[in-house]
Amino acid sequence: MIFKQEDFKVFDEQTLDGRMQGIRSVIDPKFEQLAKVILPLLSEDGQAWYAHIAKHLRRTTNPPENTWVAFAPNKRGYKMMPHYEVGMWDDHVYIYLAVEENMKPVSTQKIVAQMTKARELVARLPATFTLSQDHMVNKTEPLTLTHYDLAVQKFAETKHSEVLIGLQIMKSDYETLSFEDTNHIMATFKALRAIYEIIK
């Protein structure tokens, strides 16, 4: 078990300092714990992988509505390449394979072609998987091939758009004492790995 239901209480704190203190003391250690499990799995592809825990350094007034750890084969950063993210909102934990707007415009044409090439594998993902078009907005839709194709098209044509696919674990799932999130997280990474190999 990585996360617990009580961890979500961090988002009840409405001040910037209070929430940041909670993120640093409660959630970030969970991300560090998760990295010890995930990095060996990712490194099976022969690359050196690194964990990047969100710092929220640009926040001056409003507290962050979500926080995350990103995994990428680059020590300096992750936003300019396809990467994995495990994050937390006030109502769920998410595990995504992410292609974000920072890749534009330099890599737009290349990554769009790669995402299009991966669509058949996307179609085989579990029906429980979701699609997000903005990692900073708590809004998703079912990961259908139609939704995926539209998201890729929007990514190609719109400056502020992203493609994130994966699994959400709802806060309510943690109410069950026997629930084990580690298994779901690991299984999601494994399910997304073949797609990553195409779009990386």
From Swiss-Prot:
Stored InterPro entries: UPF0637, UPF0637_domain_sf
Gene3D superfamilies in alphabetical order: Protein of unknown function DUF1054
HAMAP family for this protein: UPF0637 (MF_01851)
Family, as annotated: Belongs to the UPF0637 family.
The name this protein goes by in its record: UPF0637 protein LCK_01372
Native source organism of the sequence: Leuconostoc citreum (strain KM20)
